[in-house]
UniProtKB/Swiss-Prot annotation:
ATP binds at residues 478, 504, 515, 528, 576-577. The active site is at residue 632. One of its GO terms (biological process) is ubiquitin-dependent protein catabolic process. Pathway: Protein modification; protein ubiquitination. Residues 63-611 are annotated as: 2 approximate repeats. There are two active sites within the E1 molecule, allowing it to accommodate two ubiquitin moieties at a time, with a new ubiquitin forming an adenylate intermediate as the previous one is transferred to the thiol site. The modification N6-succinyllysine is found at residue 528. Belongs to the ubiquitin-activating E1 family. This is Ubiquitin-like modifier-activating enzyme 1. It is linked to Spinal muscular atrophy X-linked 2: A lethal infantile form of spinal muscular atrophy, a neuromuscular disorder characterized by degeneration of the anterior horn cells of the spinal cord, leading to symmetrical muscle weakness and atrophy. Clinical features include hypotonia, areflexia, and multiple congenital contractures. The gene is UBA1. InterPro entries: E1_4HB, E1_FCCH, E1_FCCH_sf, ThiF/MoeB/HesA, ThiF_NAD_FAD-bd, Ub-activating_enz_E1_C, Ub-E1_IAD_1, UBA_E1_C_sf. Sequence repeats lie at residues 63-199, 459-611.
Length: 1058
């Protein structure tokens, strides 16, 4: 359960997206990790190549060029409270050149509310010095240094990026002016209780190489007019997706060849399939074809200095329901800095005197402000709330703002993605109690314990409640690690009766270390759940966490049974697939438990909160299915590298996995052939032919046989099959309407000639031969020279294209052909298969595709097979990195997004634990840190249904006691009668899971037999499975008619049997 893809694209409000202070002086102390880490890894920067094994998932977000620029950037993080340590953690994981931690303050009790690398024994010690060795463990490529001296100009000039957190405004302005004048990029971040602030100044001339990080789009051209401007029309298979202002280039245009290889040209979109370009009136006539591709053109952006931007700010809106709030908070934060400067402390929690003083200061700041930022009506209630919570320090707010700030540091270093221009303000006031009278100054007083920063905001009652919570965390990957860290900081399950149960059956891999920050290199191969649990116990020794290694699903319902779920207060998903998410959603709906759902995809993330009897569930809305590639496109007419990579994956399965599995079943299961013959379409023929090939026609005895097979297969796929295709459809073939057959999405292929000196050809043979040998338990070889020499002696039969071979042009044609099977051929195959008795002890070894092991030949085969086919069809090839992304279906991931998303999840957790009942208190969220874009909306209410005058939602059900007072169980007849008398509903169909227990069209004899049988006996008979002892109730689905005979929609039945 590692990286977690976006669970769903959620509805969001708003328009479409467009692109403690360091006050105690101390002696300067400089402690540095060795320049070459002790594990022998080289430092980042030009000295070393990128470690693709470690940075794999992040590279799919940033790309190699941005990653290289990141590795040449030294970063200073000033302020090592909760926010500073979050930012430092994320940029160290990200792989910058070096990080220096600066803090002149000592650890206080309140810091432990969110500073996860401080421990209780560190109270009174310098925060930077204590944090340095723990942060240095995160990434051995990044030297981490602690510095406790003043921020003087000579010191600052050694950094490419400076990050200030929890810093007085006076120091911000001084450092900001110096950085702006010297071309040093500046990020200022601050959190105050439920409020956050972020500012960026990346200089007067920053080059932005890619504003959104999306893959460049491409489309096929069907027409270009000779006009001023020329109008391009794309094939209507799919919308082109371009926007006005994009730059594009053309290739493979026939006729109007002037477009090919031209400089990127700006376009204006006219419609979903059309756009205009330059003056084409003097170009040649367009004939056919062409590919238009989006080109990312670097552009310059300019930032104002902190002092200038403070007076005339530009804001990024985080919540369109709070559109005017950033300008109000801009005034409020300036007033707060004045208050802290005058008193040496923030306003006291819930203190009315301090709140009134902050309001007065804010009014004075507003009065002095320039007209552009001056507020006609200062929101005094908002400023008062800022005063109430400003002394607080919350881990979820720090996680959110820290994730954003770290992403801005990466933008500053790499020039990749659009920076925040220039101020961002955020608040989560919905987390406060719905009853405004609950919190008092006494309840929010500091108690000299690790939760002081949180108690200052929410009071001691919520802290006690958090400690007693019992939560089930499903997954200990990237999101799971961040959730556990936040749980430990806020004190979830840390008190009497509290507990966190985390389950994950995966082990730790090297590629996890870049974002699953609870794991270290020495943890590789250990279980994720055990390791993560041990790591958070170091962060908060009071946390009561139990680790499991179980997959959630029907198979583990004896473990996660009624007792288990009924004892829970809620569930948090940290899953990486939709099926498991939907399963957990069903369980939470059934047991009526809150569910916290989230996911990430690169720089995108989403959060959904599911509240019993209030919101819809996760499964209530679903994304449209992903568009699949037509089979005929894969088999005969590819036009994109995605097509050849999918073809290569299918080849892998069809050569090295499925035949071996089928052979083993044939040899061990007497009913295998009988079962195979019952398969649909041409599947029986395909399966039995594969078994025959594996056991008779192509069974190798030696390594040399495997190399010969690989060479022959190369000729079949890249020469013979292409020649047959061109025999059926010659390059000059016309369709019935007179148009060229090879046009539009159909690219005319050409056969390849095998060349042992071509590295790609030899790559294919080496990989295919080794994998083929492995399926037979034979020993392979990595000696390329020996294989190359042997290949010169391999005799390849001459191939002549045959007449009468049917090649299907469309999937519809293929389906029609598959409807008929040659029975005589099937009988012939059955007769030629060797008897299993004649092969005692023989078995084959199916290979499961594993993308992350570079020594197993899996990706070698995929890359070679795909790129050779791409060469057949003149499709641009893909390198190993891109091929692994597409063929391995890798989910791009980066630590910054994960941190920000989990921060939002835990803000919803505060509301769930308090029991908020107003729908608008909750926030579903969507973000894209690359744009940057933030969208929040209140969850949708659970849809309401009705039968008679009875309203119901997905959270309602019929409760039926299966055991009657006399101890006997209800029969089917009694069950039907119960609904007719109690609910005036006539059941027409009744099912349990996939088993149909009753229907009105059931044969009379079967119905008569079942009516007098107990319900559980019917379930066991129909499902052919005995009910486990852990099963206390069954879920039954009904189709019903009302008294007038009309169909009515009704809830499910919870039928209790124990």
């Amino acid at each position: 359960m590692s990286s977690s893809p976006l669970s769903k694209k959620r509805r969001v409000s708003g328009p479409d997206p467009k692109p403690g202070s360091n006050c105690s002086p101390a002696q300067s102390v400089l402690s540095e990790v060795p320049s070459v880490p002790t594990n022998g890894m080289a430092k980042n920067g030009s000295e070393a190549d990128i470690d693709e094994g470690l940075y794999s998932r992040q590279l799919y977000v940033l790309g190699h060029e941005a990653m290289k620029r990141l590795q040449t950037s030294s970063v200073l993080v000033s302020g090592l409270r909760g926010l500073g340590v979050e930012i430092a953690k994320n940029i160290i994981l990200g792989g910058v050149k070096a990080v220096t931690l600066h803090d002149q303050g000592t650890a206080q009790w309140a810091d432990l509310s969110s500073q996860f690398y401080l421990r209780e024994e560190d109270i009174g010690k310098n925060r930077a010095e204590v944090s340095q060795p723990r942060l240095a463990e995160l990434n051995s490529y990044v030297p981490v240094t602690a510095y406790t001296g003043p921020l003087v100009e000579d010191f600052l000039s050694g950094f490419q990026v400076v990050v200030l957190t929890n810093t007085p405004l006076e120091d911000q302005l001084r450092v900001g002016e110096f950085c702006h004048n010297r071309g040093i990029k500046l990020v200022v971040a601050d959190t105050r209780g439920l409020f956050g602030q972020l500012f960026c100044d990346f200089g007067e001339e920053m080059i932005l190489t890619d504003s959104n990080g999306e893959q460049p789009l491409s489309a096929m051209v069907s027409m270009v007019t000779k006009d001023n401007p020329g109008v391009v029309t794309c094939l209507d298979e799919a919308r082109h997706g371009f926007e006005s202002g994009d730059f594009v280039s053309f290739s493979e245009v026939q006729g109007m060849v002037e477009l090919n290889g031209n400089q990127p040209m700006e376009i204006k979109v006219l419609g979903p399939y059309t756009f205009s370009i330059c003056d084409t009136s003097n170009f040649s006539d367009y004939i056919r074809g062409g590919i238009v591709s989006q080109v990312k053109v670097p552009k310059k952006i300019s930032f104002k200095s902190l002092v200038a931007s403070l007076a005339e700010p530009d804001f990024v809106v985080t919540d369109f329901a709070k559109f005017s709030r950033p300008a109000q908070l801009h005034i409020g934060f300036q007033a707060l800095h004045q208050f802290c400067a005058q008193h040496g402390r923030p306003p006291r929690p819930r203190n009315e005197e301090d709140a009134a003083e902050l309001v007065a200061l804010a009014q004075a700041v507003n009065a002095r402000a320039l007209p552009a930022v001056q507020q006609n009506n200062l929101d005094e209630d908002l400023i008062r709330k800022l005063a109430y919570v400003a002394a607080g320090d919350l881990a979820p707010i720090n996680a959110f703002i820290g994730g954003l700030a770290a992403q801005e540091v990466m933008k500053a270093c790499s020039g990749k993605f659009m920076p925040i221009m220039q101020w961002l303000y955020f608040d989560a006031l919905e987390c406060l109690p719905e009853d405004k009278e609950v919190l008092t100054e006494d309840k929010c007083l500091q108690r000299q314990n690790r939760y002081d920063g949180q108690v200052a905001v929410f009071g001691s009652d919520l802290q006690e409640k958090l400690g007693k919570q019992k939560y089930f965390l499903v997954g200990a990957g990237a999101i799971g690690c961040e959730l556990l860290k936040n749980f430990a900081m806020i004190g979830l399950g840390c008190g009497e009766g509290g507990e966190i149960i985390v389950t994950d059956m995966d082990t730790i891999e090297k590629s996890n270390l870049n974002r699953q920050f609870l794991f270290r290199p020495w943890d590789v191969t250990k279980l994720k759940s055990d390791t993560a649990a041990a790591a958070v116990r170091q962060m908060n020794p009071h946390i009561r966490v139990t680790s499991h290694q179980n997959r959630v699903g029907p198979d583990t319902e004896r473990i996660y049974d009624d007792d288990f779920f009924q004892n829970l207060d809620g569930v948090a998903n940290a899953l990486d697939n939709v099926d498991a998410r939907m399963y957990m959603d069903r369980r939470c709906v059934y047991y009526r438990k809150p569910l916290l759902e989230s996911g990430t995809l690169g720089t995108k993330g989403n959060v959904q909160v599911v509240i019993p009897f209030l919101t819809e569930s996760y499964s209530s809305s679903q994304d449209p299915p992903e568009k699949s590639i037509p089979i005929c496109t894969l088999k005969n007419f590819p036009n994109a590298i995605e097509h050849t990579l999918q073809w290569a994956r299918d080849e892998f399965e069809g050569l090295f996995k499925q035949p071996a599995e089928n052979v083993n079943q044939y040899l061990t299961d007497p009913k295998f052939v009988e079962r195979t013959l019952r398969l649909a379409g041409t599947q029986p023929l395909e399966v039995l032919e594969a078994v025959q090939r594996s056991l008779v026609l192509q069974r190798p005895q030696t390594w040399a046989d495997c190399v010969t097979w690989a060479c022959h297969h190369w000729h079949t796929q890249y020469s013979n099959n292409i020649r047959q295709l061109l025999h059926n459809f010659p390059p000059d073939q016309l369709t019935s309407s007179g148009a060229p057959f090879w046009s539009g999405p159909k690219r005319c292929p050409h056969p390849l000639t095998f060349d042992v000196n071509n590295p790609l050809h030899l790559d294919y043979v080496m990989a295919a031969a080794n994998l083929f040998a492995q399926t037979y338990g034979l020993t392979g070889s990595q000696d390329r020279a020996a294989v190359a020499t042997f290949l010169q002696s391999v005799q390849v039969p001459e191939f002549t294209p045959k007449s009468g071979v049917k090649i299907h042009v469309s999937d519809q044609e293929l389906q029609s052909a598959n409807a008929s099977v040659d029975d005589s051929r099937l009988e012939e195959l059955k007769a030629t298969l060797p008897s299993p008795d004649k092969l005692p002890g023989f078995k084959m070894y199916p290979i499961d595709f594993e993308k992350d092991d570079d020594s197993n030949f899996h990706m070698d085969f995929i890359v070679a097979a795909s790129n050779l086919r791409a060469e057949n069809y003149d499709i641009p090839s893909a390198d190993r990195h891109k091929s692994k992304l597409i063929a391995g279906k890798i989910i791009p991931a980066i630590a910054t997004t994960t941190a920000a998303v989990v921060g939002l999840v835990c803000l919803e957790l505060y509301k769930v634990v308090q029991g908020h009942r107003q729908l608008d208190s909750y926030k579903n969220g969507f973000l894209n840190l690359a744009l940057p874009f933030f969208g929040f909306s209140e969850p949708l209410a659970a849809p309401r249904h009705q039968y008679y005058n009875q309203e119901w939602t997905l959270w309602d059900r019929f409760e039926v006691q299966g055991l009657q007072p006399n101890g006997e169980e209800m029969t089917l007849k009694q069950f039907l009668d119960y609904f007719k008398t109690e609910h005036k509903l006539e059941i027409t169909m009744l099912s349990q899971g996939v088993s149909m227990l009753y229907s009105f069209f059931m044969p009379a004899a079967k119905l008569k037999e079942r009516l007098d049988q107990p319900m559980t006996e019917i379930v066991s008979r129909v499902s052919k499975r005995k009910l486990g002892r852990h099963v206390r109730a069954l879920v039954l689905e009904l189709c019903c008619n009302d008294e007038s005979g009309e169909d009515v929609e009704v809830p499910y039945v919870r039928y209790t049997i124990r």
